[in-house]
């Protein structure tokens, strides 16, 4: 049988839109500010300097960027924090209990264009996509090959990513299938491309045919899951670990799961 992701299982990441000061906003704000200064997205140092109260820290969420997010693996250490305010923070009084964050955001009032200004993110998204049970983070624009990363901790991402969260199939199994050469080939021919770059958007994600796990393929599906565990373990110890041999094994198992012929495999491998 085939399995397709559903609309409710796929979401784009956060749209700030003012994560930090760019040239244009610097011109508006003037000399007391600097390029790259954090607005809705803060460095550890910027967070320290705000001397936040305990309840204010609850609004800060760990945001992960592409240097943390590799194929299969997300490095757990985050360099940035997002002031995670949903549309209820459109209310001008919503920040009254968070005086230091309020003071911080008020400085940038002139340049904040969010639909939920003064304090809300433009699109905060449904928070369940960033927390709780395991998810897959997909980089929207990929050079060379698609990248799908398994994550099982709180991991907030911006709109340069999509997040897949489903309870209907084993998430490690799904990660292996999505990262396979077969699916890269499918995306190249049936998905969206910009030149040689993969454009991993919601539409292609919802159309990828995933073979479901059944009694016939359970054993090799388990092999895939174990291989993903091995990759994650290797990357955990050294994020630059070479996992190509493991990924090659995954490619070969995926060909079996999809019952491909030798000829079809040759086409995909470009031989």
Region spans (language model):
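Polybasic, glycine- and aromatic-enriched phosphate-binding surface used to engage nucleic acids
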Residues: 1-217
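Non-catalytic DNA-recognition/assembly elements of restriction-modification systems
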Residues: 59, 100-108, 210-271
